[in-house]
Amino acid sequence: MADSKEIKRVLLSPLFDNNPIALQILGVCSALAVTTKLETALVMTLAVTLVTAFSSFFISLIRNHIPNSVRIIVQMVIIASLVIVVDQVLRAYAYEISKQLSVFVGLIITNCIVMGRAEAYAMKSPPIESFMDGIGNGLGYGVILVLVGFVRELVGSGKLFGVTVLETVQNGGWYLPNGLFLLAPSAFFIIGLLIWGLRTLKPAQIEKE
């Protein structure tokens, strides 16, 4: 029987209290690369959440039958299989977004969040809790991606989901887009500000010297 308190903890804790990007500093590379648009940030969130949740679930199901010496290989095979499925579904039903995400869908295989949850939680916990832990960490990753994508697309182009929100001067409006926000380094600064804001609200997250 699944423990409801544990499910609630693993589902909600990664959102802010133990965010994989803001606190654990995992999955930063893809956060820089796929957040120029809110649409790609949301699709990447969905892809990572599905892969993390189902890989944790399947790994937890067979955890007692995996020899310790090959556990990382088994985890990688399961994760890679799920990533291939997600990649093929995106190519079939969202080809343009798949092209924009480029190699970063494939690189979910090596995402530290996915591997980390498989090794640290799924190998020691029941399947339902592991599945919910995967969803929680995927959503925690997604919260940062969506916030960064929102700021970068709006400030960088005056659009959200490709729809004009702030009329630019090129089209007779008042807004002058800041192209710097469409470059990867801008995501570093936005993530840094989010980490600062989160640790200001939650001082317990500040590392002790």
Swiss-Prot record:
| Keywords noted in UniProt | Cell inner membrane, Cell membrane, Ion transport, Membrane, NAD, Sodium, Sodium transport, Translocase, Transmembrane, Transmembrane helix, Transport, Ubiquinone
Listed as disulfide-bonded, the cysteine pairs are none
The family database entries (Pfam families) matched by this protein are listed as: Rnf-Nqr
> Listed GO cellular component terms?
plasma membrane
Q: Which NCBIfam families match?
A: nqrD, PRK09292.1, PRK12405.1
The entry sums up its family as follows: Belongs to the NqrDE/RnfAE family.
- What's this protein's name? Na(+)-translocating NADH-quinone reductase subunit D
